[in-house]
Amino acid sequence: MTTLTLLQLNDLHGYLEPHPELVRTEGGWRFERLGGVARIARLFEEARAEGACLTLDNGDTFHGTRVAVASRGEALVPIMNALKIDAMTAHWEFAYGPAGFKALAAGLDYPVL
């Protein structure tokens, strides 16, 4: 039997570096440093080295941080292309309007479904 691993990314919100997030644990709520595109890339590479993967971005990627909003998402396009995503859905990406959304999608190396 062939195994296919699904890799999912969502709600990046333009955060390229690890950042504090409030996380609920058994002991209550606490802040932890999460995320970071370099860390995500490493995890994706490790999974791909083990076998076939389908990598999906579920959106909320190109909007949120200063760099994302100031560039209307464009600054993140080459970074996201480097992650070798297979396909994406969108959510806040529509905040840049139809033309902005189309421009982002045109720059990606993968389809926006």
Regions found by a protein language model. Name each.
Residues 1-113:
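Acidic, metal/ion-coordinating pockets
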